Swiss-Prot record:
Protein name: Autophagy-related protein 23
Domain of life of the organism encoding this protein: Eukaryota
Keyword Cell membrane applies: no
UniProt keyword annotation of Cytoplasm present: yes
Keywords, ordered alphabetically: Autophagy, Coiled coil, Cytoplasm, Membrane, Protein transport, Transport
Listed GO CC annotations: cytoplasm; membrane
Protein location: Cytoplasm; Membrane
Cysteines joined through disulfide linkages: none
Functional summary from the UniProt entry: Required for cytoplasm to vacuole transport (Cvt) vesicle formation and efficient autophagy. Plays a role in ATG protein retrieval from the pre-autophagosomal structure (PAS) and is especially required for autophagy-dependent cycling of ATG9. Also plays a role in regulation of filamentous growth.
Taxon lineage: Eukaryota, Fungi, Dikarya, Ascomycota, Saccharomycotina
Length: 440
């Protein structure tokens, strides 16, 4: 909307400037005199439009203030999404670190420190019984020696008849008792170890399940971060479009693309963060520049408010004086017609001089030196030329018929010179024919 109004202001200003020559031509050349009133009306309408447009621009809810408010809102939003984006990128960096740490743990598992270790004491009392057995029996005579076991697998009749057999039975009995005791304790301790191993396996499964859960949560969090970064990227791009920022490199990937590429190219995410900080800084500087420009424009159009009022007043007063002069001369001609008396050119010249004085006073009191001043000066120059021509005229004799009615009489010079009185065809006129004045 702001651009449309500024374009309209420029077009109206150009139109006003373009009316200077047609206005002067309508005042000085008979071929264009019939356009004078239309040109004057167009000048008035253009001045009124420019004044209204200026008021619209500086109004409380006008486009300038609206644009300033919009830029301030964009600046505030950019600051918020900048902080949010940098936070998300730092989180993304943390996730990247966690992924790297997880990969390193798979390939190299560091040992635990002493403080991290939890000692588990395992009792092994069956070995005491086992050692007693080994002390009684030579290792060579145990099952560890497979050859000896094969040799002793059978007992001969001679062994039974041997006097030492009973002694050996008692020895076997003792050995058997020791082994039963060791076996009982051993099986109990195995059950304890199996229970401990079962707990270890349960812990192992729990740890694996927790790792899966954590990795799943990390993946979900990473996906959420990526989605938020994408939304931020879209919001930033929308703001850039709305403020007319063209500094965005179209070749540059979006944040989401950059994050996705982290897993491929493995760039330093710190570099990406620095790029975002720089980009936001450029955006904020651009907004500040626009805000400064709009603020200067607002102050400029505020100062123009009184200027446009002065221009409109000057032009309106000029037209009012011209109209008053035309009415005065028309009334004089009408009065002369009514009484059938003669009218002296000096009377008309006196009125022209009187109104020229008023018009010149308007120009002298005005500080304007622009288009409107030139337009009023055209009117003044036209009256001056008319006055000079009237000074060169012979005496005029009233020759108006009583049967003729006065209907918008106008001044016209029927001579070699074009009309230069500044009076339009809708206003007072006189006809020079030696010494006679006739109503058209």
């Amino acid at each position: 909307m702001l651009n449309d109004i500024l374009v309209e202001v420029a077009e109206k200003t150009q139109l006003l400037e373009s009316l200077i020559i047609p206005h002067e031509r309508a005042l000085t050349e008979s071929d264009y005199s019939d356009q004078l009133e239309n040109i004057r009306a167009e000048i008035s309408a253009t001045l009124n439009s420019l004044s209204n447009l200026n008021d619209l621009l500086i109004s409380h809810d006008g486009p300038l203030r609206t644009e300033i408010s919009s830029l301030m809102a964009s600046k505030s939003k950019l600051k918020k999404i900048n902080m949010k984006e940098l936070t998300l990128l730092n989180e993304q960096e943390t996730l990247e670190t966690l992924r790297n740490d997880s990969s390193n743990l798979e390939s190299s598992r560091p040992g635990f420190t002493t403080q991290q270790q939890q000692s588990i004491t395992i009792a092994s009392s069956y070995r005491h019984e086992l050692q007693k057995y080994l002390d009684l029996v030579d290792v060579e005579k145990t099952s560890l020696n497979t050859n000896k076991l094969a040799d002793n697998s059978k007992i001969s009749k001679e062994d039974v008849e041997n006097s030492d057999f009973n002694f050996n039975l008692k020895r076997y009995e003792k050995q058997q008792s020791i082994l039963h005791s060791a076996l009982t304790v051993n099986e109990i301790e195995i059950k304890k170890l199996e229970t401990l191993l079962k707990e270890f396996r349960k812990d192992n499964n729990f740890i694996r399940d927790e790792l899966k859960l954590i990795n799943s949560n990390l993946k979900s969090h990473e996906d959420l971060i990526s989605d938020e970064l994408k939304q931020i990227d879209e919001s930033r791009y929308a703001i850039m479009q709305s403020i007319g920022y063209s500094g965005r490199n179209e070749q540059q990937s979006s944040i989401l693309d950059s994050i996705v590429k982290l897993s491929i190219k493995k760039p330093d995410i710190r570099t990406l963060i620095q790029e975002r900080i720089e980009e936001y800084s450029n955006l904020l500087n651009f907004i500040d520049m626009k805000l400064n420009g709009l603020d200067q424009m607002l102050q400029e159009y505020k100062s123009r408010k009184s200027e446009w009022a002065e221009k409109s007043i000057l032009w309106s007063q000029c037209l009012a004086l011209i109209s008053e002069l035309e009415v005065t001369v028309r009334d004089q001609l009408s009065s002369a017609h009514t009484v059938g008396s003669e009218i002296s050119p000096d009377q008309i010249k006196a009125q022209i001089k009187k109104f020229l004085t008023k018009l010149n006073k308007l120009l002298d009191e005005s500080d304007l030196e622009d288009v409107v001043y030139s337009l009023v000066r055209n009117e003044v120059n036209s009256l001056n030329v008319a006055l000079d021509e009237m000074n060169q005229m012979p005496q005029i004799k009233n020759d108006i018929s009583d049967r003729e009615s006065i209907h918008n009489p106008s001044f016209k010079l029927i001579s070699k010179s074009p009309p230069k009185t500044g009076f339009s065809s809708e206003n007072v006129s006189y006809k020079l024919n030696n010494t006679n004045i006739k109503k058209d």
